[in-house]
Regions:
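Active-site histidine-anchored catalytic micro-motif
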Residues: 2-172
Length: 172
């Protein structure tokens, strides 16, 4: 029997976690839906540790937040085979760069992912991106990556293309 891959899933908020707040009439970060999403998947061969680090719209993240996420990735990397960071897409690239500059010799893969549309919306990309990140984190070499929309890119040099709503490698 193959050994279980230990994956740490760090939740930081973002669109993927937004739900509808009926009192305010808005989409907002609140109750985590990651457990619900994970519960809908058949996840053979992995043991997932879910860590809720923060619950923020990434546009509200500070430099300290990005560093806190990076330090948490570094700490978690010693006790698992891979790390997934669920993150808002607006500043996901900033956190990715922060992780790769803080831990250039990371010993496990770290995959950042999120969603352009919340899980509660019919045309969401949330579940696809979560599933992709769960596969990618088991297959790539140690380093920092983004996995979204059937595309995997390695940091440094990843940016969000706000017109095409996807991540791309920045031209040097």
């Amino acid at each position: 029997v193959a050994s279980l891959k230990k994956i740490t899933l760090i939740a930081t908020g973002g669109t993927i976690e937004k739900t509808y707040d009926e009192q305010e009439g808005i989409l907002a970060n609140g109750t985590s839906i990651l457990e619900l999403m994970l519960g809908s998947l058949q996840l053979d061969g992995v043991e997932i540790t879910h860590l809720s680090l923060m619950d923020k719209d990434s546009r509200e993240m500070t430099e300290q937040d990005h560093l806190h996420i990076a330090q948490t990735v570094g700490t978690c990397s010693h006790s698992c085979d891979g790390v997934i960071v669920i993150h808002g897409t607006d500043t996901l690239a900033i956190t990715g760069e922060c992780i790769v500059s803080t831990f250039p010799e990371l010993e496990v893969p770290c995959v950042l992912t999120g969603a352009m549309r919340p899980w509660i919306m019919r045309n969401t990309d949330a579940l696809q991106n979560l599933v992709e990140s769960l596969s990618v984190v088991k297959l790539v070499d140690p380093g920092v990556y983004v996995a979204m929309h059937n595309c995997v890119l390695q940091f440094p040099g990843v940016v969000k293309d706000t017109k095409q709503l996807r991540f791309i490698k920045k031209e040097s």
